[in-house]
């Protein structure tokens, strides 16, 4: 059961990384004189809410991770990749079958990069939850401390770390963190919430 969960988890991660790259590469109308937002002193020019969310969250969370010494360790990355390979083998799959050594190396690099990103994000979420508490929602790549994110962002906004000048974009940005109807919450005090940040999801067992 654990191996099947690991395979599903990593498959979603690969798709998510592809979608993430697509968002980064998407162009949006800009107005050099009127940025939609500023983040850590940098102007953000976009009319797309998803691009805005990424442009704000990425530097703020990078800064948070640096402040708290959050990173993926080599042993954790290796364990993640090993779980993935075990899961693929259990399903009778082999990503390297029929590939050249160069292609195999590229796949290994992709796995390591994916593992590093997912592990780091899980650790950031764990740290935010430990600091702010609140409710947790179910997400494809693991538990997400939604209330902690909102408090973190409200604090950073009050400190002047970011500002959204466009009222319409601001409303759509904050909706993700304030509209409960669009999320699936773990029961506060329930089993899922209790174990959410005790065991990394790629090592979870039923």
Q: Where are the language model's segments positioned?
A:
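Short, low-structural-confidence N-terminal segments
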Residues: 1-53, 58, 147-206
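A contiguous, mid-protein "functional segment" used to position or interact
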Residues: 113, 117-174
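N-terminal targeting/tethering segments
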Residues: 21-115, 206
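Extracellular/secretory pathway and lumenal proteins
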Residues: 14, 21, 69, 132-133
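Contiguous hydrophobic segments
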Residues: 71-84, 88-99, 129-143, 185-206
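Residues in flexible loops and secondary-structure boundaries
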Residues: 9, 47, 68, 80, ...
């Amino acid at each position: 059961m654990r191996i099947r969960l690991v395979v599903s988890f990593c498959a979603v991660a690969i798709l998510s990384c592809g979608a993430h790259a697509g968002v980064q590469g998407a162009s949006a109308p800009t107005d050099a004189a009127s940025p939609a937002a500023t983040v850590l002193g940098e102007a953000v020019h976009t009319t797309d809410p998803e691009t805005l969310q990424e442009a704000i969250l990425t530097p703020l969370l990078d800064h948070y991770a640096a402040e708290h010494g959050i990173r993926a360790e080599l042993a954790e990355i290796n364990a993640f990749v090993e779980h993935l390979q075990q899961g693929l083998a259990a399903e009778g799959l082999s990503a390297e079958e029929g590939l050249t050594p160069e292609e195999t190396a590229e796949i290994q690099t992709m796995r390591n990069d994916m593992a590093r990103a997912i592990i780091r994000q899980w650790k950031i979420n764990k740290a935010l939850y430990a600091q702010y508490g609140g409710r947790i929602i179910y997400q494809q790549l693991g538990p997400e401390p939604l209330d902690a994110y909102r408090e973190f962002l409200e604090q950073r906004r009050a400190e002047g770390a970011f500002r959204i000048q466009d009222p319409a974009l601001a409303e759509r940005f904050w909706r993700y963190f304030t509209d409960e109807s669009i999320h699936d919450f773990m029961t506060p005090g329930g089993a899922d919430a209790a174990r959410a940040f005790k065991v990394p999801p790629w090592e979870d067992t039923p």
